[in-house]
Amino acid sequence: MENKLFSCIESRLRGKRNYYSRFYIGPFLKNQAFLYSNVLRRVLLSDSSNIVITAVNIVGAKHEYSLLPGVRESSLDLLLNLKELVFVKDIYTKFNKSYFAYLKSNGPKIIRCSDIILPNTIYAVDSTQYIATISNNKSLILKMKLTANLLNNFYSNLNYELNSLLSYYTNDILEKTNFSLIIDPNFSCVNKVNSSLISLDNLENYNDSISLEVWTNSSYSPRIIIQNSIKSMVNLFLSIYDTSFIDIKLENSDNFLENHLVSLSNRATFFKKSFFNICTEFNTVKYKTSFDKNLTLISIDELDLSIYSKFLLKRHNILTLYDLFKIDKRVLERFYNISYKTLQSIERKMVKYGTVNK
């Protein structure tokens, strides 16, 4: 059964910051479902697709333990409340880039997430999230730095540069701000993952399936997070997948490594000889003299060269005296990594055969 099912069994919004979904994935071969569910669960928990506040500058606060006049919360409590804020970005948000937000409120007032002035590409998931409380005739001024950290996303190719004069001057001013308070960010939008195995006795050889439950903070739906996680795993293994193994035909499994190394060596030699084909043909016509055809049968082993010299020549598929003669020594020295000292030794050995490669 090659086709696998990926279906959503249940999905509900249990709160403004609690999105729950349950999925069915399978069926799989025996003992494979546990492996796949464990890998997928770990990838989901390592998600980093959220956009969060990473640094804050509070007017009147020198450090995180400072007390703000007229504000019920301390600087530390204020940072913890800002850390809990959930934001969502649209497809025009640039990833791995900093954005800036601003807050200025006068008391008496209860400050919520809706009071923050955000960039036009970032929105608050829950605008009623509590931040602080200000008493009479007091004010609270904040400058916040938001960072979007997303390495794998379906919309990463749709990041357009916004030509807004207001955003240009606003970001230019805020980038020069010294943010003294740093927040430990949590870029994950996945709150919880639970996986279990379902046994199906009515399917032959395919008797295990995965029941996957995912809770997010509503910045992304669980389905999108799962698809992004699967895509990131596929891209990871494709980047280290070697297609050269496909062309290897093995007659004996004991010679697997040896045959693979020979295949790589032949492929490198093919590219080099194809690339320098014109150069070698030109040098062959220019320097070719009367050449005894019987010399084409002479192996380079009969030249009495050093073991290292023979190794360099054979590595580039130069096996006979004719193969050595038709390649210019400048090409040998420059592109085949054969040293000048080795070339001198080869020329001395070729003198007795009545030909020298110039």
UniProtKB/Swiss-Prot annotation:
Q: Which InterPro entries match?
A: DNA-dir_RNA_pol_insert, DNA-dir_RNA_pol_RpoA/D/Rpb3, RBP11-like, RNAP_asu_C, RNApol_insert_sf
Please tell me whether the keyword tRNA-binding is annotated for this protein: no
**Stretch list, region Alpha C-terminal domain (alpha-CTD):** 287-358
Q: Give the UniProt subcellular location, in the record's own words.
A: Plastid, Chloroplast
Q: What is its EC number?
A: 2.7.7.6
Where is the segment annotated Alpha N-terminal domain (alpha-NTD)?
A: 1-244
User: A GO CC term?
Assistant: chloroplast
Q: Does the keyword Nucleotidyltransferase apply?
A: yes
Which reaction does this chain catalyze?
RNA(n) + a ribonucleoside 5'-triphosphate = RNA(n+1) + diphosphate
Provide the GO biological process annotations: DNA-templated transcription
Q: According to its UniProt record, where is this protein mainly located? A: plastid
Protein purpose: DNA-dependent RNA polymerase catalyzes the transcription of DNA into RNA using the four ribonucleoside triphosphates as substrates.
Q: What does the UniProt entry state concerning the protein's domains?
A: The N-terminal domain is essential for RNAP assembly and basal transcription, whereas the C-terminal domain is involved in interaction with transcriptional regulators and with upstream promoter elements.
Q: Which family does it belong to?
A: Belongs to the RNA polymerase alpha chain family.
Q: How does it assemble?
A: Homodimer. The RNAP catalytic core consists of 2 alpha, 1 beta, 1 beta' and 1 omega subunit. When a sigma factor is associated with the core the holoenzyme is formed, which can initiate transcription.
| Annotated protein name in UniProt | DNA-directed RNA polymerase subunit alpha
Which organism does this record belong to?
Bigelowiella natans (Pedinomonas minutissima)
Q: What is the lineage of its organism?
A: Eukaryota, Sar, Rhizaria, Cercozoa, Chlorarachniophyceae
